[in-house]
UniProtKB/Swiss-Prot annotation:
One of the Pfam families matching this protein, by short name: tRNA_synt_2f
GO CC aspect terms: cytosol
HAMAP family on file: Gly_tRNA_synth_beta
Gene (name only): glyS
Catalytic activity from the UniProt record: tRNA(Gly) + glycine + ATP = glycyl-tRNA(Gly) + AMP + diphosphate
Keywords for the protein's UniProt record, in alphabetical order: Aminoacyl-tRNA synthetase, ATP-binding, Cytoplasm, Ligase, Nucleotide-binding, Protein biosynthesis
Single GO molecular function: ATP binding
Organism name: Methylobacterium nodulans (strain LMG 21967 / CNCM I-2342 / ORS 2060)
Name of protein: Glycine--tRNA ligase beta subunit
GO-annotated biological processes: arginyl-tRNA aminoacylation; glycyl-tRNA aminoacylation
Subcellular locations according to the entry: Cytoplasm
PROSITE patterns for this protein: AA_TRNA_LIGASE_II_GLYAB
Major location (coarse): cytoplasm
Oligomer and partners: Tetramer of two alpha and two beta subunits.
SUPFAM superfamilies on file: HD-domain/PDEase-like
Length: 701
């Protein structure tokens, strides 16, 4: 079956955009084909710095014929209705329509519309220019003389040529006939910018790949990654070193080269006095190079005075000039970093605190200096809850942001916290304080490590709670996909800190403590909404671990639930209980009772929330259920008070036999009004008894 080959050849595409652009190209073209009824066997898109390419295999040469029956108005309908029908169906007169008789609706007109299938190449000639013109680049540009004309093409970088061929492997493919802003689709592409810049004629994908390889272009980004990683490891191994692997850098570098050639450079050993993270950040950020690790006798990471760079060409001198040029730049950058390091060490963190008053955190939330004071006060209050020393927690929080005004963090913001730890250690701060300065930002994401040191936990919680409470107090909350202040991440960080450390943290109390640092704002205006936000984040966190979101809703629906650790334990106990036969049957009994109550309360316009009257019990099953409810409620309440949620579930499980017997033997809607009301009150007592652990009405399934 025929294949499509499409290549869009341009100036250099930013590395960060390439993978998404390739996926967008594949999806846009294949979706457009499927919408028109053209199926295919497979599709794969590719990206290099200078081209996007798409191969779609197994397309038909022609679309299927379409036969459609379109129902029209009744025979004898008004002329306007008939004319509208003829126009929409593309008929010239009623003679072209068929009359169909229906026993119920009478006779009506039907138009039989037959459309022959279109040639695939003609459909592609419509789809491809539309996709190219409307391509969703994050940033795009116009260029040349055509850029002044309305509707001219926008592309990420100037587009030079288009390859678009279609046809079976056994025949010569045809050119897909279209042009965009004077660029005619054809069979000509170009090789590597320096190694093989001449034109290359390609007509099918099977020829396209080897032709590019001969022209020093590796089309597949994953293969470029593999080449870089394999060669870098080999170079390091040959020197007795280990490559410090970096997935993000590897992805970026693979998007910077079409013909990757790995080389090794070095720098003066004196620069190894700088913290290894600084060396890595310097070489990574400025030169897109990988650092190397030297063998260590003490188990601590020690960098080597060497680095791996990736060139986009195989130079005639073996890369000597390229290496020398990179070494000069790395030496200059590391000299700057060493200057920052030596300069920063001369100024104690404590002395830097006044400068934080000049950094605005948010126009409505004050400066970083004011924020530090709030975080320090909150950390001292939270310290007893996590087993931390209040003095150490307050001191760590006070110094936690001081490195923001250092030279090093000014140059490399991603090193905030880490540099604070280094400077704190050098200045003789206790280890717990130095560690907390680094770790108070953690966890930064779902896979990031959670701090376990008590002082670190106290400061990390204080930092995140201050952020959340502050933004809720000024009513700047995440909306849809927008979360510019990473508040979802902060809430998830609080959840992970609490659960990982078994921290008993009543959130409403923490909100009140956190908001105390904000003038003229009380927690009552936002506490419920912020608690709901935590509930949503907890659902996401537990759902990723396999928990049911409806059980979280059921527990949060009980008033006063703001202890995340106890909520999770209650959810876990509820889930285990509902997996048992007793749990499933009790849930079924609850639903039956709730449904009866809902119907009868709506019909009667009243709630049956009075206590059942034992004097009105006429059947033993009523007395048995009432007694069982009294006993189960007492045992469940006692178990919940002792935080024994499994025990509370066991207490509720004892209700199953009397509930089953009640529904088997008792007619709830008795003719006697008093008897009926009392039995409905008994069902309400069952409904309320389950609320000792959760709102069973929120449970799905």
């Amino acid at each position: 079956m025929p294949d499509l080959l499409l290549e869009l050849f341009s100036e250099e595409i930013p590395a960060r955009m390439q993978r998404r652009a390739a996926e967008d190209l594949r999806k846009l073209v294949t979706d457009a084909l499927v919408e028109r009824g053209f199926l295919y066997e497979g599709a794969k898109a590719f990206a290099t710095p200078r081209r996007l390419a798409l191969h779609i295999a197994g397309l038909p040469t022609r679309g299927k014929d379409v036969r459609e029956e379109r129902k029209g108005p009744r025979v004898g309908a008004p002329e306007a209705a008939i004319q509208g029908f003829l126009k929409s169906a593309g008929l010239t007169s009623l003679a072209d329509a068929t009359v169909v008789a229906d026993p119920k609706k009478g006779e009506f007109y039907v138009a039989v519309i037959e459309r022959p299938g279109r040639d695939t190449i003609d459909v592609l000639a419509e789809i491809l220019p539309a996709v190219i013109r409307n391509f969703p680049w994050p940033k795009s540009m116009r260029w040349g003389a055509a850029s002044t004309e309305p509707g001219s093409l926008r592309w990420v970088r100037p587009l030079h040529s288009i390859v678009a061929s279609f046809g079976p492997e056994t025949e010569t493919p045809e050119r897909v006939p279209f042009a965009i802003d004077g660029i005619e689709a054809g069979f000509t592409t170009y090789g590597h910018r320096f190694l093989a810049p001449g034109p290359i004629e390609v007509r099918r994908f099977a020829d396209y790949l080897p032709a590019l390889e001969r022209a020093r272009v590796v089309l597949d980004a994953d293969r470029r990654r593999d080449i870089i990683l394999h060669d870098a490891r080999d170079l390091a191994f040959a020197r007795g070193l280990d490559l410090v692997e970096d997935e993000g850098l590897l992805e970026e570098v693979a998007g910077l080269v079409e013909w990757p050639v790995t080389l090794m450079g070095s720098f003066d050993e004196s620069f190894l006095d700088i913290p290894p993270e600084v060396i890595r950040a310097t070489i990574r950020a400025n030169q897109k190079c990988f650092v190397l690790r030297a063998p260590s006798q003490d188990g601590r990471e020690r960098l080597a005075n060497a680095f791996i760079l990736v060139s986009n060409l195989a130079a005639s001198d073996g890369g000597a000039a390229i290496v020398a040029g990179n070494e000069r730049v790395v030496r200059a950058r590391l000299s700057d970093a060493k200057f920052f390091w030596e300069t920063d060490k001369k100024v104690p963190l404590e002395s830097r605190l006044p400068k934080l008053k000049d950094i605005v955190f948010h126009e409505k939330l004050g400066t970083q200096g004011a924020r530090v004071e709030r975080i320090a006060a909150l950390a001292r209050n939270l310290a007893p809850l996590v087993g931390a020393d209040a003095g150490l927690a307050g001191r760590a929080a006070r110094l936690a942001k001081a490195d923001l005004v250092t030279e090093m963090v000014g140059e490399f913001p991603e090193l905030q916290g880490l540099m604070g730890r280094y400077y704190a250690e050098l200045q003789g701060e206790p280890a717990a304080i130095a560690t907390a300065i680094e770790e108070h930002y953690k966890p930064l994401g779902p896979s990031d490590r959670v701090p376990t040191e008590p002082v670190s936990v106290a400061v990390a919680l204080a930092d995140k709670l201050d952020t959340l409470v502050g933004f809720w107090a000024i009513d700047e909350k995440p909306t849809g996909s927008k979360d510019p202040f990473a508040l979802r991440r902060a809430a998830l960080g609080v959840i992970r800190l609490v659960l990982a450390g078994d921290v008993r943290l009543p959130l409403l109390g923490a909100f009140a403590q956190a908001v105390a640092g904000h003038a003229a704002v009380g927690p009552e205006s936002f506490a419920a909404d912020l608690l709901g936000f935590f509930a949503d984040r907890l659902k996401v966190h537990l759902r990723d671990q396999g928990a049911r979101h409806d059980l979280i809703d059921a527990v949060f629906a009980i008033p006063g639930q703001d202890d995340l650790l106890m909520i999770v334990r209650r959810v876990e106990a509820l889930g285990r209980f509902l997996d048992t036969e007793d749990g499933r049957n009790l849930l079924a009994g609850f639903r039956r009772a709730a449904n009866i109550l809902r119907i009868e309360e709506k019909r009667d316009g009243r709630a049956y929330d009075a206590a059942p009257d034992p004097a009105l019990f006429s059947l033993p099953e009523e007395s048995a259920l009432a007694n069982a409810l009294d006993a189960a409620r007492a045992r469940a309440a006692e178990a919940v008070a002792a935080e024994d949620f499994e025990g509370a579930m066991r207490a509720l499980a004892t209700l199953r036999p009397p509930v089953d017997a009640f529904f088997d033997k008792v007619t709830v809607n008795a003719e006697d009004a008093a008897l009926r009301a009392n039995r409905l009150a008994l069902l309400n007592a069952l409904r309320e008894a389950t609320r000792a652990v959760a709102d069973f009405a929120r449970i799905e399934g």
